[in-house]
Amino acid sequence: NTQIAPKSDKYDVTVQNISVNGEIWTGVGTNTRHTFPELKDIVAANPPEASNDENCPPENACSCVMKISFGNFDYWAGGDLQYNGKSSFSWKNIELACAQVGGKVDVMKANHHGVTNTNQAEALKAHDPRHIVVCSWVDCHPRTKVLNEMITTLPNVDVHITNFWQGERPSGVDDKVTAEEAARVKLYDGHIVVRVTDGGRFYRIMTLEDVQGTMKVKKVTTKYTSR
């Protein structure tokens, strides 16, 4: 946790690197384990577009993954982690491997915008967040199935989405969000800000206006105690 260090020691902040390019921290000291196949063993007709059944790491699995802590507060930033192709190669389930070493957090950014083959139940259980923030940039973020996975796996979780589309979704691609699912989305349509205070003891989450550029605070959650 010294590779990305604060400029000042005024605050008890650490950034623990969890994974990059398939090199995953073991949870002990600076020890890591290599999970991707050796270069000589990689087989793919077109590596940049490797399919799930090819022995080649997809770009998203190479994400830089980290756990950011401030006092008792922990935040998960899993980049574009996914589990595509895990039935063909166990090492492709890098999302779960990272979640297991990263452990519990207060808030997590949903892996890979909440698209298909991400945010699996076992990874969600490992993190057990009180809040999940989804950074969306198309109408199908997060996928309805993934949103449902989040709220059924974690009965007490609140979901916050930067842009939440509740209308019809492309036929054959995704289902319309149900009223029950929509009710679990607390903050949406704006910048999602997590403000941690009192040396990491407490935090609030808020939405800021993001259309006119005023950054006006639209809504703020109650104060939560960090675990």
For the regions a protein language model found, what residue spans apply to each?
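Cap/insert and terminal regions of metallo-dependent hydrolase folds
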Residues: 52, 57-61, 82-184
